[in-house]
Amino acid sequence: MTTAGVRPAASTPPLPGSPTAGPGELRGLDLVACRPLLAGPLEVLFPLDPGDRALVAAGDAIVAGTAIAERQRDPRLVELPASATSPGARAGDRWMSAGPSGVRLRRGGGAETGELLYQHGGHWALAAGEHPEPIECPLAGVVRDVRPGVGIRIRAQGRALRGVEALGDPTHGRLSLGSERGDQRQGRLRSSSLDVGLAGTILVIGSRVDAEALTRARAMGVRGVIVSGLAGKERRDFLASEGRQRAALHRLPPFAVIVLDGAIRRPIAGPVAAILEGLAGATVAITIDPPAIVFDEPGLAVASPPPGHVRVRSGERAGEEGRWAGLAGVRRFAGGTFLEAGWVVLRDEPAVAVPIADLERFA
């Protein structure tokens, strides 16, 4: 990957609540949950189903777009005669018929190849299929482990921005902010704003997206969507659409949705938005297991948030960011609950008490 067009994080707008807190105001900040801003090299898992064929071996170096496996669209279970396998056969081995007179499916068909699954009564069960599809790796890295029927584990090259959930298939593309620069944290993806000019890109949406927009984005050739929150209804609709797409005869390119925070609608965190803005125009990958945005941009300088910068991750003020102003002790909140709280300055307003359990900081 190249670093052309990548802006350093230092050029991004200041974060909300960026004035530096005094040393005395930072007391108790260690009680706030710390969220790592970036992760080191990840180990990404690409699952394999029975019958899938791995095309790489442990130790292989790969680049983005490499076909690492073949997936069987319609795998079937075939029982082999005892004479069809050698005495040293093991579960996970690839099996191929000796010739045109080889084993055939019970419903008819040609000679079979597949993966040996298990042995029962002196006969081996074979997972076989007729329509293999390539599984492409969206990132560069080194193959660490290959386990038939389980998965391929790859150590990714570069850094990663973790999410909480990713739906769809691993993919990669050019990162696009997807909306006006000043509105990227709270932007909304509307289906009417999508066109074929966005083909091959991964869009940063902000806080709001609906299932119709996701379906249209995929049809327009968009490779992925980055959103802060995805509600339950949109999630169910997208998964149903994915199921129909997997069953289609001609599948579209891989498409993924990565959720950065959860189901509640809220803006993208300021420190995270600063990184995404710095990556605009660069090639990034979305992985499913673990859910993350992976990029290999050594020239991207990631600025640390100011001391005392905190974000409200849940509760009435979810999504707001400000400056830690010290411990507030036990306070009474909605519902008559008493919780340990801290003072937080939000939008240059007087400090308010927020439950410590509702806060997070970045490191």
Where are the regions that the model predicts?
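Well-ordered secondary-structure scaffolds
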Residues: 1-363
